[in-house]
């Protein structure tokens, strides 16, 4: 039920989220994390990119504008509709993680698979990562940007577990925040390795205003 609440929250807040992203209301993204994930993908020099959990499509669009062939997929039809309506050289499809876990994407493989703040669950994420090697072209890279555990932990104990979500700092247009599964840095690395992936790089984009990590980016390859 907890994983279902994540999808329900994103369906409820699809329009509000799209507005916040396109109006550049999320300061940490403007100052640090948007540019960081674009650079992380571009540095791999991919021809083809899969944006898993693409949301309203900003990253897929940004990468397509740089000449990459991009497919964005998301479980929320309203977000894919927003991505399509914005106009882009990227392609978009509705697909949830369960579908991808079960059957991949019809045998399609990509030079880069990227998940940008899109891995909030527990078992679903572990199962999805186990599928990633099947989605990568030879020498392909899997890139994840997520909340930095040391910063996101706050005053709670530094151990894996479900946390209640919050829309603190967002507009009143948001409601029903989604729960999310907190992982330590060690747990992220262990999960990547357990999925048949080899961590080749870790980046910690720093917010220039707070001078603290705004996120962590993992770059991995199939073993």
Stretches with model-predicted labels:
Residues 50-52, 56-101:
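Class I SAM-dependent methyltransferase SAM/SAH-binding core
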Residues 126-141:
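A short glycine-rich, Lys/Arg-flanked "PGG" loop and its adjoining helix->strand segment in the class I
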Residues 112-126:
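A short SAM/SAH-binding and catalytic strip from SAM-dependent methyltransferases
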Residues 210-223:
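Core SAM-dependent methyltransferase catalytic element
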Residues 102-113:
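A short acidic, Gly/Pro-enriched loop at the edge of an enzyme's catalytic core
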């Amino acid at each position: 039920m907890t994983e279902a609440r994540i999808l329900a929250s994103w369906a409820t807040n699809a329009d509000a989220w799209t507005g916040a992203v396109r109006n550049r209301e999320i300061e940490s993204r403007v100052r640090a994390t948007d540019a960081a994930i674009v650079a992380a993908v571009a540095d791999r020099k991919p021809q083809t990119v899969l944006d898993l959990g693409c949301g309203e499509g900003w990253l897929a669009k940004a990468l397509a504008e740089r000449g990459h062939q991009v497919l964005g997929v998301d479980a929320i039809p309203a977000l894919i509709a927003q991505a399509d309506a914005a106009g882009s050289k990227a392609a978009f499809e509705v697909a949830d993680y369960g579908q991808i876990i079960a059957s991949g994407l019809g045998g399609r493989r990509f030079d880069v698979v990227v998940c940008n703040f899109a891995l909030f669950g527990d078992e679903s994420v572990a199962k999805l990562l186990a599928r990633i090697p099947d989605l990568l072209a030879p020498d392909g890279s899997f890139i994840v940007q997520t909340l930095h555990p040391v910063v996101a932990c706050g005053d709670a104990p530094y151990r894996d577990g479900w946390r209640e979500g919050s829309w603190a700092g967002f507009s009143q247009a948001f409601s029903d925040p989604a729960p999310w599964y907190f992982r330590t840095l060690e747990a992220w690395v262990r999960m990547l390795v357990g999925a048949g992936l080899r961590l080749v790089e870790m980046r910690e984009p720093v917010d220039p205003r707070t001078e603290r990590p705004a996120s962590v980016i993992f770059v991995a390859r199939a073993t």
